[in-house]
């Protein structure tokens, strides 16, 4: 019945991943603007974005877009493992994608945002907390200490300097899972990944009390579920139909289950199908969207501290819309600088760092996978 599969439309680099990542990053800025302004011209509001109101609190743009980021990441990072020559090659690509931009934004927050917005300028550079934040990249994957001395303490969203970075540690855990599965030859038996995805969805559907005893655990299982769904879409793309009829079914199920208040039951699977359908929709003229550069990671890194800074100086004069527009323009400028002077130059080092590739060459990557899957990465820009 469904002859066309995802494998047929996912060949090569003509896809819309770059556009989708940029869109999701922009929507996170939009969503956060409502959280930054819980009072608007003296009137108390609930801080929910329009999608939160439409769904009666079942979903908001911020959380939804973060989940979609992990969904795309699961697909692309699995492809990255499959195309890597070794564990060292894979680790090098992941490290060069994540850490250069992260290190620079931490320096930016510590030495630009901090002194500009602190109430303790005289002692700011003498406090250990200042430099503990600077070295977030060394310990932040295990413990997030997202505050600087006296910075943003009177903001409506107090203390948090860069609240978006909480996803970094979960992203790194997911990368480790992809590598572990590869080293254990799990991708030769993709049913294991499918079973893991089903288990994670069952845990989320079950609303088990222990999952909500820890916000960190709940956040991890949520993002991890979407990442594994992305892995499943990658490994089973030869079997999953690419069908407009199934797209309509997915969209209709989202609408119906939203209306009856049970959106969580269909959201992960329906979202996965819809997002990947759009990602490989050739008729959308978006395949060259990132030709000027891949600015989505820069938007992710810089948006939160820029929004906090704007609120710090101009809160009485801002609305969620004006905050979104101002923050987007400033953050986009920083993202362009980050791409051209930090991320892109560091990504050119992928062919270097032979010491890491050599030390970990005894863990094969591509050779451990079925030959049919050993293709080049499909994203037009690095993931």
Regions picked out by a protein language model, each given a short descriptive name:
Residues 18, 24-27, 132-268, 311-312, ...:
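Aromatic-enriched alpha-helical transmembrane segments of multi-pass intramembrane proteins
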Residues 252-344:
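Alpha-helical transmembrane segments of multi-pass integral membrane proteins
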């Amino acid at each position: 019945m469904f002859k066309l599969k995802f494998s047929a439309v996912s060949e090569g680099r003509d896809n819309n991943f770059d556009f989708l990542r940029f869109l999701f990053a922009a929507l996170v800025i939009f969503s956060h603007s409502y959280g930054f302004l819980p009072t608007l011209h003296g009137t108390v509001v609930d801080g929910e974005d329009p999608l939160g109101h439409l769904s009666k609190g079942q979903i908001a743009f911020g959380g939804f877009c973060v989940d979609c980021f992990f969904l795309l990441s699961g697909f692309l990072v699995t492809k990255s493992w499959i195309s890597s020559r070794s564990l060292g090659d894979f680790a090098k690509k992941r490290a060069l994608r994540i850490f250069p931009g992260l290190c620079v934004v931490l320096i930016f927050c510590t030495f630009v945002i901090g002194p500009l917005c602190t109430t303790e300028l005289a002692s700011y550079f003498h406090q250990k907390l200042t430099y503990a934040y600077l070295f977030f990249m060394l310990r932040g994957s295990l413990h997030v200490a997202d505050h600087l001395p006296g910075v943003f303490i009177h903001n409506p969203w107090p203390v948090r300097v860069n609240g978006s970075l909480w996803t970094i540690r979960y992203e790194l855990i997911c990368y480790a899972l992809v590598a572990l599965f590869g080293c254990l030859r799990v991708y030769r038996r993709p049913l294991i990944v499918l079973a893991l995805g089903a288990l994670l969805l069952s845990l989320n559907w079950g609303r088990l009390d222990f999952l909500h005893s820890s916000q960190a655990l709940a956040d991890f299982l949520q993002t991890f579920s979407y990442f594994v769904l992305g892995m499943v879409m990658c490994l089973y793309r030869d079997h999953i139909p690419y069908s407009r009829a199934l797209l309509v079914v997915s969209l209709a199920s989202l609408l119906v289950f939203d209306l009856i208040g049970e959106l969580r039951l269909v959201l992960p699977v329906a979202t996965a199908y819809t997002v990947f359908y759009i990602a490989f929709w050739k008729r959308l003229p978006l395949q060259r969207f990132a030709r000027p550069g891949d600015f989505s990671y820069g938007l992710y890194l810089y948006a939160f501290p820029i929004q906090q800074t704007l609120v710090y100086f101009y809160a009485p004069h801002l609305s969620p819309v004006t905050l979104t527009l101002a923050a987007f323009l400033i953050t986009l400028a920083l993202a362009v600088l980050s791409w051209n002077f930090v991320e892109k130059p560091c990504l050119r080092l992928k062919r270097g760092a032979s010491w890491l590739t050599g030390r970990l060459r005894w863990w094969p990557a591509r050779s451990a996978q079925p030959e049919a899957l050993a293709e080049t990465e499909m994203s037009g820009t690095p993931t």
